[in-house]
Amino acid sequence: MKSEHLLGTSIPRFTYDTPTVPGNDFYALCEGEHPLCMIFLPGFDHPVSREYITRYLKTLPQLKGARLVCVVRSSAQAVAKATHGSDSPFPVICDGPGVLYGYLGVEQTRGLLSWSFAAQKIYKAARDAGYHYDTKAPQLLPLTLVVGHLGKILFTHSGRSQTDLPEDCAAISEIVRAVEKATAPTDGPADPHCSDETLTLPDLVGWDN
């Protein structure tokens, strides 16, 4: 299932945990001068997640006119343990149960079907470093969203491979600038019913938007 049907809809208000702060308001995160670029990754310990989060950290000075949020399929406790409780310069939303992934229809595929050449290089480096993985296991594909006020989805891209996502913060800035330019004349308010109630991530299960 592709993600184009999400364009123009609104993500309901919910609270989320980061590795260091629980119970954050998603709509408060959406407020700001520039839209959010939300990038959905596999678990925090997955080689692809580690590779791209590292790239974003290294290229953060190139993030101009945009804001970045990474979503990982890991619990806040697991990420806090892996990072020794250190803060990230951009929010990392921890969705261990995968509620957001299910709500937004984040796709997965089996094994080698999702392995781009870049992914093969990432896996080889991880294997050489001692990481073991099941080549036949289903793999989450990345989802990139640009989100405005009240959770309105302004842009969506479902990755066709595990590395089909913005390669660095410069690419993120370019995407957000293009989206702002394209949506500025017609960007209307988000569906007001979505801001009436603050949900927790589990509350999104079965939500009918």
Give a label for each model feature:
Residues 182-209:
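Cysteine/selenocysteine-centered motifs that mediate thiol-based redox chemistry or coordinate metal-sulfur cofactors
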Residues 7, 31-34, 64, 140:
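Residue-level preference for short coil/turn positions at secondary-structure junctions
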Residues 1-31:
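N-terminal "domain-start" segment that seeds a small globular fold
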Residues 160-182:
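A short, polar/charged loop-to-alpha-helix boundary motif
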Residues 95-164:
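Thiol/selenol-based redox catalytic cores and closely related redox-interacting motifs
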Residues 13, 36, 143:
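Conserved beta-strand and immediately adjacent loop positions that scaffold enzyme active sites
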